[in-house]
Structure formats: C-alpha cells, structure tokens
Amino acid sequence: MVNTSFETLALDMQIEILARLPLKYLMRCMCVSKKWASLIRGEDFRSAYLLRSMARPRLLFVASRSRKFTRETCFHSVYQEPPLLLSGKRQMLTDNHIAPVFTVSNPILGLLCHQGYNNEIVICNPGLKKFRNLPQIQVPEGASVRSFFGYDKVDKVFKVLCVCVPQTQFGAGWTSKEPKKYQVYTVRSDHEKPSFWRPIICNDDHSVVTDEGLFNGGFLYYGARSSCNKPMVMRFNVSSEAFAVIKLPEEVDIDYHWRLVNYKGKVALVNTFDSKFKFNGVFEIWVRNEVDRKWDKDIIKIPQWTESVDNYNVYFKGTTGTKELVFAPPNWFGEPLFVLYYDKATTNLRRFDIEGMDDQHYSFHTFLDHVDSTWLM
C-alpha cells in the first residue's frame, strides 16, 4: 500500500486525529489497513479515546421487553451534562443477542455486564454494538448466581465476580450452612488468549441480597448476609481478588430493596422502599466515610417533589460530575420517560423528558457516566 500523508505523520499525531472520530467511523478506518486496525486496537489509542470520551459522559438507558417470539434489549444514551439531554442521542436495539436480562452492571470504561435468567453472562459495548458471551458458569443443581463487574487497574483487564448460592438463601433472612462458590472470569482483549472461570476463596462466607453492586475505586461493593444472617456490605478488591467485610449501622437491615450508589465519589446506600421519599421527597442516604471507617447518615428533602414525579416511583441513581443528584424510574409502561436532576446547593429540581423510545412495556435501568470506548473492537 502506498503511504498516505496521514501515515507519514508521527504516531502521537495519528492517535490525536483518530481519537476525534465517532466509533462508527473508527470501525470503517479499521478496514483500511492492518496498520490502522492495529493502531486503533492498541492500548495507547484506547487510553486517548477514553480520555476524550470522559469529557462528555452519557446517561445510558438499558431497557428489556418480551415479544411473542423474541426478546429485545434497547440501549439508548444522551449526553448527561449541558446542553443536558438535548444532544448526542444514540440508540441500539438488539434481537436475541443477549438472554432475558436479570441484572445489568454499572458501565465501566464503556462496557457493561449482563446476566440473564438462565445465568448466561454477556459483556457488551453498546457504542460499538459488540457482544461477547462468556463461557457458561458451572453451578450446583438448584443454585443461583449473582454476578458483579469490575476493572483491574493494575493488569488493565476487566473481571466478572460470580457468587453461587443455594436457592433457599435468596432474600433477607434466608441462611444455610451449605458452602457458597466464588468464581472469577478475566475479560481480555480480543487478540489475547481466552480466559476461563477460576475458583477463588472467601473466608467470610455470605449470601448476596442486593440485585446490583457498585464498582468504585478499584473495589466491588454489594449487600450481603453472613451465614448467621448478619447484614453487611462485602468489598472485593478486583486486583488482588481479596474479600473484606464492611459493617453496617444497626439501622440498616439490608435486603434487596437497598441499592449501592456513587454519591459524590463515595459509596452510599439508599433504601428504594422508603415511603417518605416516594410521597414527600424526603430520603435518607448512608454515605461511607473510608477515613473514619463509618457510615454517615444524610437526610435530603427535595422541594416540589410530588409535582415533578406525578406519583411515579423513582430511584436515586447517583450524582453527576457537577454534584447533581439524579433520579429515574425503574420501569417504563409507555408514559413519558423522564429523569430528575436535583442541585442540593441551589435546591433546583429539573425534570427532563427522554424522547426517542417507543411506548412499549420495558424493565428499565438508568446509568450515569457511560463513555465510548474501543474495548471489544
């Protein structure tokens, strides 16, 4: 191939130019030559592309629905910072690419982890419309699985943690002396050799009680119960693959109603079953103080709450880079889809309707800080 003016540029200049392109154009560039494909798949370019994408994070909506013969999942995203929700709209609709969605992880560096009701686990890059099915995890008969997704900053790989528990242990108050199984899968780049499920040891046997976990600062967090039914939060170091127990205040009797969220960069707990929040706009949030190793309770009262939510059920999803609190519904039944942004400093509550999705019944997940990345290219 004859050298073009682009190929005569310095490598860092080539990366700078390509990093400005949307993902769909990068896919086309990879077809130009093996050299371009190698450059775009490289670690230097991946880091440069992520850095630019993080400057404009996105709100990501993941919705699933059943039709007569198919199961569909819709990925819909918009920019989450000003001009808020009015630009950058992008949508992808899958048809049987992934199993019926049971849980969806928070996005990490552009990737999500889906777990189906049949325990099928799929890694997805919605920006690239790329999927990778992980090997079927082997579980004991009658057992169920909870999966959590994290990133190892040391080795620069993603990892999926799976906790296999006996069926009778699900839900708060259910305990058993039967041993659980803990396994990890390392998600590597396409050009690297495939991985496999590896058993790991946890010295603090526990059952998972929250449907979703939280990845924050190199650690995975999720709600759990000990073998003696004591509520706690488990912390998993994604790099060292070591578990640790975080004690909870006596007021927090954690079960599947609780959610772990990112609150201004800190790990926090909220109870989605709090009736005061649903009807009065008053909710309690427990924020983890790692310096003092304790949980601090914060009570937040939001003005004009009932006028803004119209009696819909909404969950607290976390905070944006501008420290605004974000709320969104857990389900969508064809009514206007919306999100709420609340600024504690100014007490300003804003509602934004989300357009571009049809009026079908969806189970619904809303995520903050989604970015474009070249993982799975």
UniProtKB/Swiss-Prot annotation:
Residues 3-48 form the F-box domain. InterPro entries: F-box-assoc_dom_typ3 (IPR013187), F-box-assoc_interact_dom (IPR017451), F-box-like_dom_sf (IPR036047), F-box_dom (IPR001810). It comes from the Eukaryota. Pfam families: F-box, FBA_3. Gene3D superfamilies: 1.20.1280.50. This is Putative F-box protein At1g70380. It comes from Arabidopsis thaliana (Mouse-ear cress).
